[in-house]
A protein has these predicted regions:
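A short acidic, often aromatic-flanked loop/helix-cap motif at beta-alpha or helix-coil junctions
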Residues: 45-48, 76
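Thiol-based oxidoreductase modules, predominantly thioredoxin-like and allied folds used
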Residues: 8, 31-46
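Non-catalytic interaction surface on structured domains
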Residues: 19-22, 30-34, 61, 65, ...
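Generic recognition of short, well-ordered alpha-helical segments
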Residues: 16-20, 51-52, 74
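Non-catalytic, surface beta->alpha helical segment in thiol-disulfide oxidoreductase systems
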Residues: 62-91
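Alpha-helix termini
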Residues: 26-32, 87-90
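Local sequence-structure signature of Cys/Sec-based thiol-disulfide redox active-site neighborhoods
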Residues: 1-28
Length: 91
């Protein structure tokens, strides 16, 4: 099983939606609870994200591979589908 790393920023509404989606999906599927997740605040930990290729948050990585990068037009359903796809890939 692989670890998912979520890059986020405080006050980001898309990041709040990603967190909500993760919690909902884990509530619906016990297997998702076994996936290790790490949340990195890019403002507080710039050294951890300096070499990563992304512009928008939230962004989800599995190892060094980017699985999802939010865009300003993404609605909750798009974010939820993307979080689910990342969880499925991590299993």
């Amino acid at each position: 099983m692989n670890k998912l790393t979520f890059l986020y920023m405080q006050g980001c509404p898309y990041c709040v939606k990603a967190k909500k989606a993760l919690e909902e999906l884990q509530g619906e599927n016990e297997a998702y609870k076994a996936v290790e997740t790490e949340w990195i605040d890019e403002d507080r930990n710039p050294q951890l994200v300096a070499n990563l290729d992304y512009y928008y948050v939230p962004t989800i990585y599995m190892g060094d591979r980017k699985l999802y990068e939010a865009h300003p037009s993404d609605d909750y359903d798009k974010i939820r589908r993307s979080v689910k796809a990342a969880l499925d890939e991590a299993l």
